[in-house]
Amino acid sequence: MDYPPLKGAALAWVTLSLGLAVFMEVLDTTIANVAVPVIAGNLGAATTQGTWVITSFSVANAVSVPLTGFLAKRIGEVKLFTAAAAGFVIASWLCGIAPNLQSLVVFRILQGFIAGPLIPLSQSLLMASYPPAKRMLALALWAMTVVVAPVLGPILGGWISGNWHWGWIFFINIPIGIISAWITWKHLKHRETATVRTPTDYVGLTLMMVGIGALQMMLDRGKELDWFASGEIITLGITALVCLSYFIVWELGEKYPIVDLSLFKDRNFTVGAIATSLGFMVYMGTLTLLPLVLQTNLGYTSAWAGLAAAPVGILPVFLSPLIGRFGNKIDMRLLVTASFLTFAFTFYWRTDFYADMDIGNVIWPQFWQGVGVAMFFLPLTTITLSHMKGGQIAAAGSLSNFLRVLMGGVGVSVVSTLWERREALHHTRFAEHITPYSATLHETAAHLSQQGISDGQTLGIINNTITQQGFIIGSNEIFLAGSILFIVLIPIVWLAKPPFHSGGGGH
């Protein structure tokens, strides 16, 4: 069913409400990360147990996102979005009052599952509310919230956990979610999408939930359990491989599939989804690595690490609306190419990190990386959805967002593991030069002994210095690899075929 575009104040309010929901959901994926030690300690649990606060949300969210297209057809996009925003409020309140870790994990599972439809439906409803000529501007405003929220998450999480009860990490969602749900329902309840009652593909649903759940669990817990040295990780990996392989075969032959894999027959959707997922994998991996380097090796507090990383969100706030307004005059592939080149340049800029560098070495690459971020989400989303019509937008949005989030998790897991293993390699190589016959060792020991430091303490200081250097060199190598990967990704984007327009129709 087609509706005329919204105008004036109604369009502004809907844009605000949909943007708030996206901001709330994306913020919640990162805000708890820095607060895990505080939450675990307050609830009488070990920090390693506290990581389930993050894992539970990501697993439930990963399972839920691909269901969006299926649920939207049965319930209606407006009802589903409003219910998800309202449900997120309730789940956030429950998380904030959780009396123990077990309850918090259960409520985070609920919160993650409910949050699944918010991002893909915000795309679909936003595009249906704007006239075709202005849909790129709508996507630009949407992309701006996706960029800023994960940057603010660690800063807010660290500040709240350091100054208030950790429950406020979740309570801040309550007014945002209420406003979003109320405004959306008020302005869009008469613009509900058509619903279709089709048989439920229970086999596909079960295979997808088990397969994706096992895969996300493997990614979240792999580093902690030393990957495939652990029987649990092997079991999760085999479960994910078998279930997802069978899921793909089953869905391709199913008349009423849970996930419409036929979307991959569209060239632009496939190219856009692949480029977005792989680019986001590299981006998220390094975005997570930077605060770790700053806190564990360069002596930054969590608050200062968050502030040092924050400049990446400055330029997108100003550039995204401009790209949305004038981007339809430029080939989307050129914008993505410029984005990937900017990422490659700023990543290479970081390959000379050293132990006593000042904060400017961190801030300036982050600041200019914002140019790449501004030209990343909007053009790639436009390419991905360029041939989608009406109800296909929600299904395509949910599938592409699922792949993006999944590959972002892969990036975080791979980068954190590589970082530790590169440190171990460099530590071993440096330690080989510390022998009883080493002139450097004797000079260092003599210098430290003059300051009243014992031989045992001297060896400890040297070991810590080697560890610090190993981690810094490891991070420099990862940034270099990220720079190369972004260059390699550029040809993929040029496989997309113009014309590019932001979705093919309304509802």
UniProtKB/Swiss-Prot annotation:
Major localization class: membrane
Localization (cell): Cell inner membrane
GO cellular component: plasma membrane
Gene ablation phenotype (knockout): Mutant is hypersusceptible to long-chained fatty acids such as palmitic acid, oleic acid and linoleic acid.
CDD domains tied to this protein: MFS_LmrB_MDR_like
Xref: Pfam families: MFS_1 (PF07690)
Endpoints of the signal sequence: none
InterPro entries per record: EmrB-like, MFS, MFS_dom, MFS_trans_sf
Entry's Gene Ontology molecular function annotations: transmembrane transporter activity
Keyword field: Cell inner membrane, Cell membrane, Membrane, Transmembrane, Transmembrane helix, Transport
Stated induction or repression of this protein's expression: Expression is positively regulated by MtrR. MtrR acts by modulating the expression of the regulatory protein FarR, which directly controls the expression of the farAB operon.
Membrane topology type: Multi-pass membrane protein
Gene3D superfamilies: MFS general substrate transporter like domains (1.20.1250.20), Multidrug resistance protein D (1.20.1720.10)
Spans through the membrane: 8-28, 52-72, 78-98, 109-129, 136-156, 164-184, 199-219, 233-253, 274-294, 303-323, 334-354, 363-383, 399-419, 478-498
UniProt cross-references to PANTHER family, sorted A to Z: MAJOR FACILITATOR SUPERFAMILY MULTIDRUG TRANSPORTER MFSC
Subunit: Probably part of a tripartite efflux system FarAB-MtrE, which is composed of an inner membrane transporter, FarB, a periplasmic membrane fusion protein, FarA, and an outer membrane component, MtrE.
Function in brief: Mediates resistance to long-chained antibacterial fatty acids (FAs). Function is dependent on the MtrE outer membrane protein.
Family that this chain belongs to: Belongs to the major facilitator superfamily. EmrB family.
Protein name: Fatty acid resistance protein FarB
Annotated organism of origin: Neisseria gonorrhoeae
Species lineage: Bacteria, Pseudomonadati, Pseudomonadota, Betaproteobacteria, Neisseriales
